[in-house]
């Protein structure tokens, strides 16, 4: 992937290293079940890697469930004895999380052909647009790649910490292996994030090419419009491939944060264990940050697509002697006006800042409802 190799600067090197790490980790865990055909320069699906990933994560899920049940039999949290409602909510959250991770891992296998099409389209674009676009370093691309990986590393550390803290007779190596399902969950989310940020980078390069070019031929405008159309179709394919997984993931983030805050209130206020605020704050911050990054990257790509219309307007407002050039510009502007980068879940809910704020407010209101409902037990 020469186009995405570091060109200059520490952030470029770091972003490239993180993308490589995600790729090799996904291969190692069977979550990216493809091999590279060097002759055709395309990815092809490997049934052995699919089978390996499915068996590995099935065993890890069974191990994690066994470890959780063993810990539950040995010790019951004091907070659960203090507040029975908290125990019920926590158990339902555990079941929901287990179900979500299982579905995401199964969907990763089921939709592997679609993922292959997306990856191959990105590889094809890489080879075809070198002479068409003005290649530059995209600051937001590097920034969001680094931020997402830092958030994922934080999630990994928290998962390992909680697995090691489980009170059962399992050796530490088995406790660490119990983290594989949550690691797989983060890598699957990382795939979606990477696909969206790569689409954003191409759209950003289209805008930069238009802004930097004082004299554009009709053939180049037509080629840019064709590229823009391919990026629109690619973004639709990415969302169609990941909409169910993204819905489940967003639900898990919000439920998890609500349960955790309620847990902190019971421990900190009812049981007067104020130190728990300091211990649990990093996890809460990382959860909200990770949730918000998935919202922002979709909103960023959508706004970048809207920016293309504004850049084209600068060209269409000018008078052109070349009728073919004017026709190409009008067709490109028409495409940008009637088809936009909108990342919608199941074709209904747009992923943007407004949706993110609404979900956070809904989660907060649900927490208030819990406190009012169970006020006498606090």
Curated annotation (Swiss-Prot):
Membrane topology: Multi-pass membrane protein
Pfam families attached to this UniProt entry: 7tm_7
Residue spans, topological domain Extracellular: 35-48, 110-143, 200-245, 376-378
Coiled-coil annotated residue ranges, if any: none
GO molecular function, a single term: taste receptor activity
GO cellular component, one term: axon
Intervals, Cytoplasmic compartment: 1-13, 70-88, 165-178, 267-354
Compartments where located: Cell membrane
UniProt KW Membrane keyword: yes
Protein family membership: Belongs to the insect chemoreceptor superfamily. Gustatory receptor (GR) family. Gr22e subfamily.
PANTHER family listed in its UniProt record: GUSTATORY AND ODORANT RECEPTOR 63A-RELATED (PTHR21143:SF131), INVERTEBRATE GUSTATORY RECEPTOR (PTHR21143)
Name of this protein: Putative gustatory receptor 22f
Record organism: Drosophila melanogaster (Fruit fly)
